[in-house]
A protein has these predicted regions:
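Well-ordered beta-strand positions
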Residues: 7, 71-72, 95-96
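Glycine-rich portal/gate segments that line the openings of hydrophobic small-molecule binding cavities
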Residues: 36-86, 99, 115
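Hydrophobic ligand-binding cavity/cleft-lining segments
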Residues: 1-43
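Well-ordered beta-strand positions in beta-sheet-rich domains
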Residues: 3-7, 63-67, 89-91, 105
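Secondary-structure transition/hinge residues
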Residues: 23, 27, 56, 125-128
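Hydrophobic pocket/interface hotspot
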Residues: 14-19, 25, 50, 70, ...
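Beta-strand/loop substructures that line and gate deep hydrophobic ligand-binding cavities in soluble
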Residues: 77-130
Length: 130
């Protein structure tokens, strides 16, 4: 697993509230452009249909669908999921730090977790400024 971490300028409860909303996944997870959660929403065992755009220099862009399986949730501390295509295991951990800040750690079996953390940082920072 490859891991990245960054301190966010928001309390852990606010960051968790953002992460626990299925529709926000496409706002911060690279490559995902839309989410259709099942009726369980943010719960272990839930399956979310996710959309992404595949780009090919010969055939152009096309929308593809895959599935996210929510594995484990420890409220305000961690959650893990598995993306079916491309096969990727993900774990997000939150740690409260001084001054109403949150240390977020993202570990992935494939890809660059720093991209997700940077997008999450930008979104949380924007919300904190509103």
């Amino acid at each position: 697993m490859t891991e990245a971490s960054l301190e966010l300028l928001a309390p852990r409860a606010d960051v968790w509230g953002f992460l626990a909303e299925p529709y926000h996944l496409s706002d911060w997870w690279p490559g995902i452009t839309g989410v259709d959660p099942d009726l369980r929403g943010f719960a272990p065992g839930a399956r979310w249909k996710v959309h992404s755009t595949k780009r090919n220099i010969f055939t152009g862009s096309r929308v593809v669908e895959t599935m996210v399986l929510i594995r484990e949730i420890e409220p305000y501390e961690r959650w893990s999921w598995h993306l079916l295509q491309p096969p990727t295991d993900v774990e997000v951990r939150l740690h409260a730090v001084a001054g109403d800040r949150t240390l977020v750690r993202v570990a992935v079996s494939r890809g660059n977790p720093a991209l997700a953390i940077k997008r999450l940082y930008d979104l949380v920072q924007t919300a904190a400024e509103l």
